Amino acid sequence: MRFIEIVGKALTEISGNLAKDYVMEISRFHRIQASPGFHEAALFIKDTLAELGYEPKLHKFPADGKRVYLDGWVAPIGWRVFEAELKVTKPEKVNIGRYPEIPTLVIARSASKPDGIEAELIDVGTGMFDNEYKVDVEGKFVLASGRARIVHEKAVKERGAIGIIIYNEKLEVPDAVPYVAIWPTLDEIDKVGLGFSISYRQALRLKNLLKRKGSLTVYGMVKSEFFQSHLEVVEAEIEGSLNEYVLLIAHLCHPKPGAHDNASGSGLLLEIARALQKLIEKEFKLNLGVKFLWVPEFYGTIAYVDSYKDSIRNIKAVVNLDMVGASQEKTGGVLTVVGVAPFNPTFLPLLAYYTLKESAKPLRYYSDHEMLPSLKYTLVPYIDGSDHHVFIDPIWSIPATAYTEWPDKYYHTNLDSVDNLSPKILKIVGSATLALALYLASFNNKSLIESVCICDSVARSYVEERFLELLKDGYEYASLKLKYLGKWMSEAISSLELLVENPKVKEAVIKRSREFKEYVASKASALARLKDCGCIKTVKIKRVDDTRVLMRTKKCPLHLGNVLKRLPKAEREYFIRYLFVERKSFGHDIIYFLFDGKRKVTDVFEEYYAHYKDADPDTFTRLVDALVKTGWLKEQS
């Protein structure tokens, strides 16, 4: 069956309304990792799958605050919250909020003070740097805009504050209360203070009261507890003729309501599971099986991979659903397909983009039904930040991509509600995902030839679009970018060879990859001609001169928090300022996966610079040195 026919079948079977119903049910649970709310949500997923005819499994991995998975990620400890309240008591009374009325009011893994406590409130700016603590905060609450874990360390651990009250001044919606968490290990829970999160508008009110009244007393009460728990992963599968799988994954965690992030992905995955059953009953036979996973983001995925290393090798492709189905008019987002990874270039993002493009066409293209809405979507350079990143690690080298919408003005707040989701967009993304899974699971020589043509076409369009943008970046950088785009995309096309046994088909894959390299070479020649006629500026290329050859020591994604907490104060504060005050990115997760133990640091920087033109050589060098110092990288002898 041709790809376009499979897309039509998927569009006919997937229901956006059913998907939204599943999302609504999931959004009723307060789904903090390793909490009772997550457990209840996992049981809902498991029970629903059983009703659909699956035989689901509920995997449990210790979440005790001390277990280390894949030699780099310490499991969170279980935590639950029962009730909480925050209010100003003096010099006037102001009710700020209560839990569970505001699900994000309590910082996840806050300490418990069931009888409550009154204390003075001190504004400490970001609260992340020593020079902001101009007065003694011992026994007091601090109001801060910085990262909760860092503020907690500075205010509570180092200075004896009672607790922290966090706000985010960068939120687009000033009345939204952000989701905030700290992640204490087992040996740190006795040092945890109270933690609250408030809206920016509430923070401005407190700041104004402090300015007018001189001092404020606030009352904070949290009834919560830490306990030994589990990271729970729900798994279901439909077997194919081979003991190999296409994996569809979504993270189930995040606080109530967490509709877009990520009840949307989890609910849509249930609908895909339902629709897949129906299509297999009607007409499809699978070579590869299709496996479904619902996980606590990163932590659960890493624990699962650590526990099932052998079976992970049987996964041939991974599609991650993380924040899908939002009404773009409401949230302001664009649906993105996570692109080709520089450290593991594969065909899957190119195929996923084409599938989405076909699924986003008017439904009447396939039938006489209603039109689908217009959709903003794009193929973006590789980004990490979700569970696909665990599988695409060069250690496993599994083709992986994700459908994800970004930005979202309600992201990680109490206003991330089901009302912001669109059944029609859920239908488009669900159809694309289902069609992609079916196509991959029923691969044959004919479909492989079709895939080569599709991937080549998408890759050429991607380069053409970026070529015009590159003209603005100067000849030297444009040449560097083209060099690596040619490398990444040709390797992505040739990765289809791994699925091929027929010699003629394999030859066709290799030929198309070679032709793509020739195409990119022609673009480089065109660039040189533009330079010769003075139509493009010249620029100085950034460089890092470091001949060391370094390799990873961990079989997991980089845990930056683990690195920062082990650095000397001055070095730690450099990264804190860079990331959380200047709000710059340095792609630490991508950089880590580029270290293969074969190339010089100079060459790793060059490839990362080609991926991200704003790469800063000094920050890159500092990061590399920090990773060596903390044992995440080691020098090859």
Residues covered by each model-derived region:
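Noncatalytic luminal/extracellular "stalk/propeptide" segments of secretory-pathway proteins
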Residues: R2-G8, E13-N17, D21-E138
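Metal-dependent peptidase/peptidase-like ectodomains
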Residues: I14, G195-F196, A203, N243, ...
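Catalytic-core environment of secreted peptidases
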Residues: G16-E25, I32-G37, D47-P56, W79, ...
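Soluble metallo-hydrolase cores and metallopeptidase-like ectodomains found primarily
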Residues: W79, E101-N131, W183-N262, E271-G289, ...
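Extracellular/luminal Protease-associated
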Residues: G97-L194, P257, D261, D589-Y592, ...
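Charged, amphipathic alpha-helical linkers/stalks
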Residues: S422-L498
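Short alpha-helical segments that sit at the start of domains
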Residues: P557-D589
